[in-house]
C-alpha cells in the first residue's frame, strides 16, 4: 500500500501464472490470427499498389432478391461477428479487434486495435446490428451481445457525464463524436423500447452540450452539423425546450462560421469541402432540418448558400464534384 506494507493474498494468482495460463490456451488458430495482425500492422498503406480510376457512370440493374437470400446474407454476417467476438470470462463484456487506417497520408499505416465507442468504426454500430437482429430473430445469444456492448457504452457515458475537465477536446459529430452515442441510444430505444436507452440518451445529450461550443469541424461526421441532427431527433421524441434551445444555438454557430462563398472550412481543411460527410451539403442538410422545425428564415438561407457552393464545384465533363 502507500505505506509500503505488503497486502498478502490480494490477487488470486500471480501475473506470471496468469500469462502462463493464457499461453497454454492458445491454439494454431490464434497463431494464424496473430500472424495476420502482425502482417497488417507492419504494412504501410502507401506500399500497396492501388489502381486509381475515375468512375464516370455507374450502371446498376435491379434484380429481385427473395427473403431467403437476404436472411442467408444476414446470418453470414452474424456468424462472422459471433466467431470473432472476444468475451470476458463471465461473458458480460464483449469487443472485437478491428483494422483501421491511421497516420498522415504519406506515412499512413494500418492500426490493429479493439473497436472504440463511436458509431463510425466502433461498438455502437455492432450494437444496432444485434438489436435489430434480436428484434427479428429473437435469440438469447444476440441479446447477450447487445447487453455486453450496452454495458461498455453506459460505462463510457457515465464517465463522460461526470468528467469535469477535458470534454471540450472531444468531437461532437454524429458518427465520430459524442453525438454518435446519443444517436445510437435513440436507435436502440426505437428497436427495443427499453427505458434504459432513454435514460442514457438524456445523460449523453448533457455530454454533447459540454462539447458543441468548442467544435471546429462543423461537419456531419466529426462536428456540430452531426450533433444538430441527433439533438433534433431527441427533441422529436422529447419536445423539451432545452433541447430546442441547444439545436438553435448550434444552428446559429454554424451560420456564424459559414464562409463568404457559402462553404465551411473545418479545423483540418485547407479549403471548404463538398460532400455530405465532411462538406457543405451535409451541414446544409442539418440547417435545413432546423429550418423545417423552427421556420426561421436564416437557417433556410444559410442552407441554400451551402447547396449553391456545393453545386459550384460540379464538373459537367467529369460528371462529378
Predicted regions and their residues:
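Short, conserved phosphate-binding/catalytic loop or strand-edge motifs used
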Residues: 177-181, 202-208, 222-229
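Glycine- and aromatic-rich loop/turn segments at beta-sheet edges
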Residues: 84-112, 154-172, 204-222, 255-274, ...
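Glycine-centered tight-turn and secondary-structure capping sites
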Residues: 118-125, 174-180, 223, 279-282
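Well-ordered alpha-helical scaffold segments within catalytic/enzyme domains
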Residues: 58-64, 124-139, 180-194, 228-240, ...
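Regulatory N- and C-terminal appendages and interdomain linkers associated
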Residues: 1-121, 125, 129, 163-173
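Solenoidal tandem-repeat scaffolds enriched in leucines and small polar residues
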Residues: 218-301
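Helix-terminus loop motifs that line ligand-binding clefts
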Residues: 140-184
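Extended, well-ordered alpha-helical scaffold segments
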Residues: 66-84, 138-158, 193-211, 239-257, ...
